[in-house]
């Protein structure tokens, strides 16, 4: 738990991953000319306990699968795909649209959201990342894969 080199390497990897996903989502939304947001995107702009619960459940499944040889390690990848990638993609879309976005809510629209979409979805990403990290730490400690020494 105190391996500074591994922590730095992990932080750099996560940072590059975040930049890659946000950058790719921005380029694709710019290239496709996205001009309005549907409920799937706006739903990822305000974190709630259900989102955190999904991230924690995915973390339990993913980290537990890594402690068992008979279980596939791809479950950990599914945890990332479910909890981390969607909010990062929404952040990229929000950054591309900037203050010119229009969100569609049912029959009405709301214009001029500035970057609330990007900020809210990035907050969801951070909450999910922290939830996955802490939950995985607990699962690994319960499975005796480390100590506080």
Specify the residue positions occupied by each region the protein language model found.
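Pore- and pathway-forming membrane helices of multi-pass small-molecule/ion transporters and channels
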Residues: 1, 52-106, 131-137
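Membrane-water interface at transmembrane helix exits
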Residues: 24-33, 62, 66, 93, ...
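Structural signal for the N-terminal portions of transmembrane helices
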Residues: 9, 79, 107-130, 149
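Transmembrane helix-bundle signature of multi-pass membrane transporters/permeases
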Residues: 14-18, 48, 60, 79-87, ...
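Peri-membrane helix termini and adjoining interfacial loops of integral membrane proteins
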Residues: 30-36, 99-109
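Alpha-helical transmembrane segments and their membrane-interface boundaries
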Residues: 1-59, 69-72, 117
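Membrane-embedded alpha-helical segments of integral membrane proteins
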Residues: 91-92, 116-144
